Amino acid sequence: MKAVQFTSLGLPTEVLKVVELPKPAPAEGEIRVKVTKANIIPADIMFIQGKYGIRPELPQIGGFEGTGTVDACGAGVEMPLGTGVIFTGSGVWAEYVCIPAKTAIPKPQAMSDDVACQAFVNPFTAYGMLMEADLQAGDWVMLTAANSAFSKFVIQLASQRGINVIGTVRSDEQKQALLDLGAKAIINEKTENIYKAVKTATDGVMVKAAFDAVGGALADKVLNAMQANGKMFVYGLLSLQPIPLNSGLLIFKNLTIKGFWLSTWMASLTREQRSTIIPEVLTKLTKQDLKADIEASYSIDEILKAIAHMEGPGRSGKILLDFSK
């Protein structure tokens, strides 16, 4: 089978190679999935560079999120062959992957593979962060990197609940689509004063919560635009720069900054919560109450082109790997 592998840590363009490997055999409790589509997310890039929350076991196959059909079952597993599944785990960028059967999520029949391969990480992170922020109708939440797939899911979920969203982008061309999606205000971080823009948009109320993917000076500006007792949830570091914290601001506004990692949040849920949240999110995606944008699909042999496109400026949708190409 073909797989995208790296044998050392570094930039994807320097360390990724498409290789031929034996088709894996499912162990006890596992299923083998014939992968149809896979997502490319920032966590994939951080993992390849050794900057993610888990370390690669070299040689390592890349990719964390995908969809496909059950191709074989290990001992103790009874799952019909051909069953569509949504799954996460390391080593997804391959034509076949073995995963624990209990972690596979059945794919709704009406859900396309384009949506299914991105149906877990970003939608559930958006749901989880809104849940942790405990926002109510009328509250304000601010998003950095508002044009990202994650932020678009937050905008949709929040607006459905009457929560007001402000976002930052790096070009005016990105504004209108996000406003059409449900955001109340979009700020060009390069040309506008963030504090003044937030004050105007919120009529001086400022924001109760912020979801930050960038870090650095931008996150510091967002903290300054928060109301007393506000909470910032940090889930990324696109700038690769730490947040320069203003101790006085934290003290006198009683601000809270905390990290958010989907794996930790999912593990914290009760069985009852999981049985409610997972179907709710998948139903919204299937009915397109949550819309997932796709910009382009590439074959596994085009992985370097796909990553270059994913990391390039001005992108408006997800970049996928299509294993049928």
What are these regions (language model features)?
Residues 67-89:
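A glycine-/small-residue-rich N-terminal strand-loop-strand element
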Residues 194-204:
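Short amphipathic alpha-helix with an adjacent loop that forms part of the alpha/beta core around
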Residues 287-296, 304-325:
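C-terminal capping/lid region of NAD(P)-dependent oxidoreductase domains
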